Amino acid sequence: MTTILKHLPINQRVGIAFSGGLDTSAALLWMQKKGAIPYAYTANLGQPDEEDYEAIPRKAMEYGAEKARLIDCRKQLVAEGIAAIQCGAFHNTTAGVTYFNTTPLGRAVTGTMLVAAMKEDDVNIWGDGSTYKGNDIERFYRYGLLTNAELKIYKPWLDTDFIDELGGRHEMSEFMIQSGFDYKMSTEKAYSTDSNMLGATHEAKDLEFLNSSVKIVNPIMGVKFWDENVVVKAEEVTVRFERGYPVALNGVVFDDSVELMMEANRIGGRHGLGMSDQIENRIIEAKSRGIYEAPGMALLHIAYERLLTGIHNEDTIEQYHANGRVLGRLLYQGRWFDPQALMLRDSIQRWVASEITGEVTLELRRGNDYSILNTVSDNLTYKPERLTMEKGDSVFSPDDRIGQLTMRNLDITDTREKLFNYVETGLLTSSAATGLPQVDNNNLSSGRGLQDKRQ
């Protein structure tokens, strides 16, 4: 039995994720005129570019919605964002600059909370504005069906009748005007923007071309730190964590996690912290490009990982990074609530995040330029007296180290024998300069690698 409806279901309740923009406004009005019973659901995600959330449901009612609801998703969104920080659930990085998966986090919250609200209203058909080429269509599909097993999916943008009548923004605007609504299209930007309180995504249009840089973007959460005319003053900030959770900024304790994230955004945003330019692999394996903002997430992430490296041992940190990358990819794919993701989340939060208690002081400058000024924690295993280069008491003696090095002789002997065995098989070549077998870089640079030598 199919879950995707290709044509508008007449005389049935159809829920639509309603943003108040031209696309969803025209879709809602069109569905109502064609005989469906539209219900509008708007997620309050703390979007930095939204001025009046309360006005959005009122618009939906004007356009013909049977019912319109505003769902406050902010607290849940921040909870999921902090969980992602605790787990390092970020897999897209370029030269150490991270994308904080803010859109996938928003979809996880929206896709579950809106469908749960629809279920309360006995609405079992859902539509949203995602296109068939992107990631969101699959994310919403998964989260929707996980939340309501009886859910059917109807998307106007997959309905040929809708596309034939209102296939472009101009046609949508004319349709609204002809229907008695003085709806004017907003000025077209050179790119598309989607945001929530964790971060903003800028993509498409001019940004699809790699010779269009971050410089064409007007940040909505930060500043144009690349513009020399923009004054950005250095600023010190202290972040405190308790058992993996951020609790204070600059000595101010926040009981409300939403307010803490908003303040972190304000602090990081003053510097353009957390902006990144990424080429990534969509769920369908095609590459796309996005420019991202996430000032608060970046600030908390830096402080969290500073404490992490001072508290946990090398093997734990390695597992944190490895599992975090896997978890980040699952999040990106719309699998944040799947068992394989929950397993990784639980283990990292239980055994890694629970020990992250302390304070980190940073100096923020322009963009992602910062310095760590101080790190304080009762849980630090970093203890300078253990390895001090100065004369004094030590936890081990020179004789202890001699014994430890002597134990390495077995491994060194075995390794040396293997290297010379590789010379005999042709995998390595002898080197008079170093006395050790070496990879033949001349062969590698001419296009011949180890596989050629095996033949």
Curated annotation (Swiss-Prot):
CDD domains: ASS (cd01999). InterPro entries: Arg_succ_synth_type2_subfam (IPR023437), Arginosuc_syn_C (IPR048268), Arginosuc_syn_N (IPR048267), Arginosuc_synth (IPR001518), Arginosuc_synth_CS (IPR018223), Arginosuc_synth_type_1_subfam (IPR023434), AS_cat/multimer_dom_body (IPR024074), AS_multimer_C_tail (IPR024073). GO terms for cellular component: cytoplasm. ATP binds at residues 17-25, 43, 129, 131, 136, 194. Residues 434-448 have a biased composition (Polar residues). One of its GO terms (biological process) is L-arginine biosynthetic process. Its main location: cytoplasm. GO terms for molecular function: argininosuccinate synthase activity; ATP binding; protein homodimerization activity. It is found in: Cytoplasm. It holds the Pfam family Arginosuc_syn_C. L-aspartate binds at residues 131, 135-136. It catalyses: L-citrulline + L-aspartate + ATP = 2-(N(omega)-L-arginino)succinate + AMP + diphosphate + H(+). Its EC number is 6.3.4.5. Pathway: Amino-acid biosynthesis; L-arginine biosynthesis; L-arginine from L-ornithine and carbamoyl phosphate: step 2/3. Residues 434-455 are annotated as: Disordered. It is an enzyme of class 6 (ligase). L-citrulline binds at residues 99, 135, 139, 192, 201, 203, 280. Keywords: Amino-acid biosynthesis, Arginine biosynthesis, ATP-binding, Cytoplasm, Ligase, Nucleotide-binding. Homotetramer. Belongs to the argininosuccinate synthase family. Type 2 subfamily. NCBIfam families: argG, PRK05370.1. This is Argininosuccinate synthase. It comes from Yersinia pestis. The lineage of its organism: Bacteria, Pseudomonadati, Pseudomonadota, Gammaproteobacteria, Enterobacterales. The gene is argG.
